[in-house]
Structure formats: C-alpha cells, structure tokens
Amino acid sequence: MQKVTIQEAEHLLQEIMSEEDDRFQILIKDERKGVQKLILKWYKQKELAQKEKEKFLEMSKYENALREKGLTYIAGIDEVGRGPLAGPVVTAAVILPEDFYIPGLNDSKKLSEAKRERFYGEIKAKAIAIGVGIVSPQVIDEINIYQATKQAMLDAIANLSCTPEYLLIDAMKLPTPIPQTSIIKGDAKSISISAASIIAKVTRDRMMKELGEKYPAYGFEQHMGYGTKQHLEAIEAHGVLEEHRKSFAPIKDMIQK
C-alpha cells in the first residue's frame, strides 16, 4: 500500500476492524503525527465499543436466563413522569427479539435527547411488540400517583400485540397472573426495561412539547412539567391548568389559598 494522505488514512481506519488487517500494520508504522493521532482515536473507539458490548451483555442477563428456560415473550416495563406537577404518567412495555443489539443502551435519563430519539427509532423498528400506557393528571388526582403508575403499566401490557410470558419491571409489583420480577434501578440493569424507559420517555416528552405549543407561557417543552423555578413562576403568573396535578404540592396549596 502506497503512502496515503491523512484524510485517506482516516477513511481506511473506519473500514479496518482488526489490528491484524495488513492496512493497519502499514498505518501503525507511519510516523506522521496526524496518522498516529488517528491510530490512538481508533484504539479508543475500539475500547469504548468493547465496554458497550460488555455492558449490554451484563444488561441481558435477566432476559438470557429466562430464554434458557424456554421463554420468548419477555416484556420490560418502565414508567416516566411520576414526579412532575403537570402532564400524564407514561409507561411502556417492550418485548425484544433474542438478536436485539443496540450498543450504548442505558437508562433513558442518562442519555442525551438526540440519542434517545435515535434509540427510540431503532427499538420501534426491531422490537417484537411495544405497548404504551398513559394515565391523565385527573386520574392521578383521583387514585394517587402510585396506583396511577400501576394502572398505566397494566394498560401498557394490555396494549402489547402479543401476551408476554414474563415481566421484568422497574421497581414495581403488578397485580397480574403473569410471572414477574421487580428490579430496583432496572432501567440500568435490563435491556428490556431500558428499552421501555426510552419509549416511555420519548413518548411523554413529545406530549409535553405539544403542551408547550398549546400553552407557550408555561415552558412545558423545557421542564416537561417538573417543578422548576420557571414552571412555578408561570403558575403564579398565569394560574393552574387542567393539565396540572391538583393533588401535588405546591399546586394543592395554591388552589387552597
């Protein structure tokens, strides 16, 4: 291989998968600083990819153990929106195929919005089934947020296109005959729960952005209904909306004034 430009070396390294590649052996002997920087970057990317693969395998242990018992339809379930002062609580149930692989998958709260959106599209395209459950602020006020979250999770299961054989749930127990395991911080320990957290988060964020367009003075598209200074000041200035949870402090106190 004749001497290549720095740009050509960069393109080659994008194609090269292994140190054993003859082209890599030539590039690694190239003493130009630009090429050596690219080699270092290549090693760092490989190290990151390996760490992501190991993390993904670790997060697949619950699903793999159940598959070894002959189960196929394993649903991960998670919620988003228990804490906000406005908007619904949203849950998702996701059944993934055995060959599912998205490196970098993690708890939705630890991902950037751009990454969540990308993963959302990939999960939607690859999942065996996805069900979403949405419970309104009015119902939250009637039955409390804990019961509303359980109801939303049961709705998400009911909205799946196939019946799950097993449930992996983030920190909840559900009143259903389907066998289940509750996992504390499950969105960082199970790929199915992590996928569900991403579906639920993106679904709810999109709903809150629509609310932001409907009520521009409240800034819902920025705080997603959480009790930020901006949100509380907007409530003081413009009043409580039907989308607010009237059983939540400080909304409850504002109404009683």
Curated annotation (Swiss-Prot):
Assigned keywords, A-Z: Cytoplasm, Endonuclease, Hydrolase, Manganese, Metal-binding, Nuclease
Catalytic activity: Endonucleolytic cleavage to 5'-phosphomonoester
PROSITE patterns: RNASE_H_2 (PS51975)
Cofactor: record remark: Manganese or magnesium. Binds 1 divalent metal ion per monomer in the absence of substrate. May bind a second metal ion after substrate binding.
Domain of life where this protein originates: Bacteria
InterPro entries referenced in this protein's UniProt entry, alphabetically: RNase_HII, RNase_HII/HIII, RNase_HII/HIII_dom, RNaseH-like_sf, RNaseH_sf
Needed co-factor(s): Mn(2+); Mg(2+)
MF annotations from Gene Ontology: manganese ion binding; RNA binding; RNA-DNA hybrid ribonuclease activity
EC numbers on record: 3.1.26.4
RNase H type-2 domain sequence ranges: 72-257
Keyword Cell inner membrane set for record: no
GO biological process: DNA replication, removal of RNA primer; mismatch repair
Binding site for a divalent metal cation: D78, E79, D170
Keyword Zinc-finger: no
Subcellular location: Cytoplasm
Top EC class of this enzyme: hydrolase
Family according to the record: Belongs to the RNase HII family.
NCBIfam families associated with the record: PRK00015.1-1 (NF000594), PRK00015.1-3 (NF000595)
Entry protein name: Ribonuclease HII
Source species taxonomy: Bacteria, Bacillati, Bacillota, Bacilli, Bacillales
Gene name of this polypeptide: rnhB
